[in-house]
Each structure stands twice: as structure tokens, then as C-alpha cells.
């Protein structure tokens, strides 16, 4: 979920420090629905370790113990579990990985031991599931040692090195040896909205896009309609900044087989025939020409 930082600074009174105090603050807020909470790894790590935690440095044994105590306290106060992020898609406003992204199994299992002391809780993780990280090995070890259920975000994604079938096979293998790992799926496919007035579109990485990116809507559309500018823009090759998110930029600029027109019916299950790539082929055009 993405939101402006001003929504937090203007919409919340920061009148707590501990997790139990946070729950008390939530209790005082008017709301239309019930809410459940998880103790967040990033906040706990930064609180215990300061800049070392925010910078994803390795913790000491005492750091891990302190984090485990805070998480245990949070669960005893009413949290349903603990959550951690291990994906390069989750970054701070400065572009840095959120605290805990690269935490090693010793830290994660140490925190889970604190959860076990509380007597309940679900350990939740969102990960890129890079094969070399051996995520399912430590998830299995954690669950078997602590008895906790461990859940991960199971997605079929063009940017994940491990497909969904492999994810589920590894989960079942660990569970056959006594672990309790569960896969969580999205209620619908997730994606990005691309357009002239959004943060990105298929032409954002072409050099000439800089000429129109900051224009107001009327001037931008007029420039894009200019045949000479359109020809120049289409002739250029996208230039991607060096980043661990480069693959995402390439998908936005070149992944027309996975891009669809957003129509008034908001169809979240379009067919392959409705993709920009297929419509372009039918029209005898390239993907970027059609877009």
C-alpha cells in the first residue's frame, strides 16, 4: 500500500512509544471497523538498534534479545503476530531498504522465540523468495522449533525467481517434516496504473520524456500529439537507471503482453487477447506505437 507521508503526520497523533501504548492509542480512535495488529519488524529493529538497525547492519545477541522482548510484549498486549519485509520493493522515501530486509535467520528465529514465550502469534513474511536465500529452510526450522505458524506471500510474478508451483512444493516439503507454513495469496491480481499523469508510463525511461514530464496536462498532451515529437519519442531506446528495481522499469516500458487498457468496467481479469501487445499486433503496430 502506498500513501503520502503527510497522511500520517496530519492524520495521527503520535502519542505512544511502546506497542501496548500504540494499541491504547488505536483504541481511542473512532472507527467503523474492527482492526487487528501485527508487531512490525522494521519499527522494532530501528527502535532497538537505531541507525544500525535502519541501515540493515547485523545485530548483536543482545539486540536480538531486546527485539524478542518487545515483540513478546506486543503479542501479550493483543497483537495477532509479527510481520517482516524481505523484498526490494519495500523502501523508505529515501530509497533505502526498510529495516530488517536482509536480516539473517538467527535474528528472525530469535524474534520468533519471543513470540513463542507469549504463547501465540503468526509470523508473517513478504519476500522476493530469491532461491539463494533459502527462505523455506529457515521458515521450516522456525516453525518446528517454536510451534508457530509461519506465513508468506505466495505470488506468481514475472519478477520472482521462484514460480508459484515451486513455492508451494517447498512449503509442502517443509510441512511434511513437521513445520506449519502457510501460503497467503492476493484476493485479486496486483499491478500498477500507468499513464501520462501517473508516476510512470511506458515512455518514462526514454530520453525525450524529460521534455514533457513536468508540463501541465494540456501542454503535455499537445506536445505528445505533435507528430515530430511523437516520432522522436518512439525512435528512442529506454535508458534504465542502475537499480535493484531495474527489472520493474523494464516491465513498465516493455512488458506490453502484461499491460491492458483500464476501461470503465475495471476488469481485473482481462484475457491475453486484450493485452496491449496483442491489440498492437492485430493493428500491425509495435507495443509502444499502440500505447
Tell where the protein language model's regions lie, with residue ranges.
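A gly/proline- and charged-residue-enriched helix-loop-helix capping module
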Residues: 5-13
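Core domains of carbohydrate- and sulfate-ester-processing enzymes
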Residues: 12-21
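Active-site neighborhoods of metal-dependent hydrolases
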Residues: 25, 32, 38-48, 55-63, ...
Amino acid at each position: 500500500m502506498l500513501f503520502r507521508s503527510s497522511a500520517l503526520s496530519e492524520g495521527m497523533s503520535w502519542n505512544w512509544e511502546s506497542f501496548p501504548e500504540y494499541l491504547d492509542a488505536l483504541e481511542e480512535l473512532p472507527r467503523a471497523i474492527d482492526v487487528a495488529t501485527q508487531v512490525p519488524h522494521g519499527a522494532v529493529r530501528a527502535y532497538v538498534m537505531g541507525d544500525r538497525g535502519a541501515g540493515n547492519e547485523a545485530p548483536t545477541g543482545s539486540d536480538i534479545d531486546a527485539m524478542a522482548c518487545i515483540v513478546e510484549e506486543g503479542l501479550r498486549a493483543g497483537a495477532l503476530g509479527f510481520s517482516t519485509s524481505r523484498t526490494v520493493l519495500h523502501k523508505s522515501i529515501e530509497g533505502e531498504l526498510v529495516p530488517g530486509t536482509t536480516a539473517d535467520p538467527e535474528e528472525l528465529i530469535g524474534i520468533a522465540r519471543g513470540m513463542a514465550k507469549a504463547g501465540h502469534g503468526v509470523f508473517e513474511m513478504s519476500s522476493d523468495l530469491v532461491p539463494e536465500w533459502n527462505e523455506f529452510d529457515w521458515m521450516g526450522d522456525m516453525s518446528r522449533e517454536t510451534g508457530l505458524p509461519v506465513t508468506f506471500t505466495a505470488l506468481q510474478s514475472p519478477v520472482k525467481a521462484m514460480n508459484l508451483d515451486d513455492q508451494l512444493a517447498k512449503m509442502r516439503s517443509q510441512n511434511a517434516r513437521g513445520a506449519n507454513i502457510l501460503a497467503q495469496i492476493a484476493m485479486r491480481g496486483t499491478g500498477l496504473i500507468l499513464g501520462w499523469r501517473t508516476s510512470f508510463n511506458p515512455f518514462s525511461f526514454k530520453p525525450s520524456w524529460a521534455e514533457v514530464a513536468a508540463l501541465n496536462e494540456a501542454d503535455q498532451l499537445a506536445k505528445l500529439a505533435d507528430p515530430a515529437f511523437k516520432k522522436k519519442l518512439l525512435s528512442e531506446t529506454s535508458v534504465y537507471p542502475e537499480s535493484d528495481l531495474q527489472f520493474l522499469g523494464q516491465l513498465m516500458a516493455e512488458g506490453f503482453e502484461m499491460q491492458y487498457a483500464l476501461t470503465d468496467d475495471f476488469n481485473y481479469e482481462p484475457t491475453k487477447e486484450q493485452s496491449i501487445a496483442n491489440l498492437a499486433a492485430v493493428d500491425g503496430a509495435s507495443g509502444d506505437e499502440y500505447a
